[in-house]
């Protein structure tokens, strides 16, 4: 095997947007990692459905394309 070709494998502190933190090991190269979802708040693991508010996006779409008439 070739020497010194593998990245360093170090401990990383992972912080979720829900506030949950845990340590793992990674080749990331940074001491901290921020994620949006983790096992503590992901709907698959919690059994609760997370509702994503897309009303603003839908309203913008309707304002932009609401006056378009169908062709044909």
From Swiss-Prot:
GO biological process, one term: translation
Membrane spanning residue stretches: none
Key words, A-Z: Metal-binding, Ribonucleoprotein, Ribosomal protein, RNA-binding, rRNA-binding, Zinc
Pfam families: Ribosomal_L31 (PF01197)
Listed GO MF terms: metal ion binding; rRNA binding; structural constituent of ribosome
Entry's cofactor comment: Binds 1 zinc ion per subunit.
Domain of life: Bacteria
Cofactor(s) required, per the database record: Zn(2+)
Binding site for Zn(2+): 16, 18, 38, 41
Record GO cellular component, one term: ribosome
Alphabetized InterPro entries for the sequence: Ribosomal_bL28/bL31-like_sf (IPR034704), Ribosomal_bL31 (IPR002150), Ribosomal_bL31_A (IPR027491), Ribosomal_bL31_sf (IPR042105)
UniProt record similarity statement: Belongs to the bacterial ribosomal protein bL31 family. Type A subfamily.
Assembly and interaction partners: Part of the 50S ribosomal subunit.
PANTHER family listed in its UniProt record: 50S RIBOSOMAL PROTEIN L31, CHLOROPLASTIC, LARGE RIBOSOMAL SUBUNIT PROTEIN BL31A
NCBIfam families on file: L31 (TIGR00105), PRK00019.1 (NF000612), PRK00528.1 (NF001809)
Function: Binds the 23S rRNA.
Protein name (Swiss-Prot/TrEMBL): Large ribosomal subunit protein bL31
Organism encoding this protein: Aromatoleum aromaticum (strain DSM 19018 / LMG 30748 / EbN1) (Azoarcus sp. (strain EbN1))
């Amino acid at each position: 095997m070739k020497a010194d070709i593998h990245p360093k494998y170090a401990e990383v502190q992972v912080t979720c947007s829900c506030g949950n933190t845990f340590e793992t090991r990674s080749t990331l190269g940074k001491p901290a990692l921020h994620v949006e979802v983790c096992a503590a708040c992901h709907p698959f693991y919690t059994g609760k459905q997370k509702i994503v508010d897309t009303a603003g996006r839908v309203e913008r779409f309707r304002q932009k394309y609401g006056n378009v008439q169908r062709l044909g």
